């Protein structure tokens, strides 16, 4: 994904998007995302849980694969400047990846090589970040009035797990189905899905 290192978990890129921003432009957008109420809340919750979110925790990079960003244990969040063009996209990636970081913070034994662990964090990130709100799905070309959110989350979880070398297609689907109810209904640190 990123030139330096592959993340444990990444956000899906919209292939229909225009060419992205420079690293400096993207870094400015990241700084602006820190004013987003959900981003602020997630960062505060990480700090309260004992996980420091330093100045370089979220950084803009040039990515080699068609992804929007990722979270890597011990390194933080990367936002792919070359695939993002507007502030809302950057906000969305930062929120999605902060949920992965929060999951790792609160579950000290989270193992990204374990398909069930990875699936659970992807389910939560998809559900809690708003990745699958109706408007976003419509813009991606997925038009369905009923059940679109859960269908979207499942599609995106499986796509993310395909990038995990420890999860075969069958193992990914089985893991997602096994943890779905528990992880979809786990809205921590929110009282309910935003």
UniProtKB/Swiss-Prot annotation:
Query: Which region ranges are annotated with the description Disordered?
Result: 1-20
Question: Which Pfam families does the UniProt record give?
Answer: Peptidase_M76 (PF09768)
Organism listed in the record = Arabidopsis thaliana (Mouse-ear cress)
Enumerate the subcellular locations listed in this protein's record, separating them with semicolons.
Mitochondrion inner membrane
The annotated phenotype of a deletion mutant is: No visible phenotype.
Q: Which of UniProt's keywords are assigned here? A: Hydrolase, Membrane, Metal-binding, Metalloprotease, Mitochondrion, Mitochondrion inner membrane, Protease
Q: Is Metal-binding found in the keyword set?
A: yes
Disulfide cross-links: none
**Which taxonomic lineage does the organism of this UniProt entry have?**
Eukaryota, Viridiplantae, Streptophyta, Embryophyta, Tracheophyta
Kindly report, in one word, the top-level EC class recorded for this enzyme.
Answer: hydrolase
Give the protein's recorded name. Answer: Mitochondrial inner membrane protease ATP23
Q: What is its EC number?
A: 3.4.24.-
């Amino acid at each position: 994904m990123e030139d330096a290192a592959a993340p444990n978990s990444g956000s899906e890129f919209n292939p229909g998007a225009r060419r992205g921003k420079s690293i400096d432009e993207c870094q400015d957008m990241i700084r602006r995302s820190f004013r987003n109420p959900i981003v602020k809340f997630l960062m505060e919750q990480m700090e309260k849980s004992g996980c420091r979110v330093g100045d370089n925790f979220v950084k803009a990079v040039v990515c080699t694969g068609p992804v929007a960003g990722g979270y890597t244990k011990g390194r933080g969040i990367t936002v792919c400047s070359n695939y993002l063009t507007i502030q809302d996209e950057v906000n969305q990636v930062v929120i999605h990846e902060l949920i992965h970081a929060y999951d790792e913070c609160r579950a000290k034994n989270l193992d990204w090589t374990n398909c069930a662990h990875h699936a659970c964090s992807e389910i939560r990130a998809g559900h809690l970040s708003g990745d699958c709100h109706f408007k976003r799905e419509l813009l991606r070309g997925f038009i369905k009035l009923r059940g679109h959110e859960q269908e979207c989350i499942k599609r995106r979880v499986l796509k993310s797990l395909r990038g995990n070398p420890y999860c075969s297609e069958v193992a990914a689907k089985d893991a997602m189905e096994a943890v779905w109810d528990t992880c979809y209904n786990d809205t921590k640190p929110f009282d309910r899905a935003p």
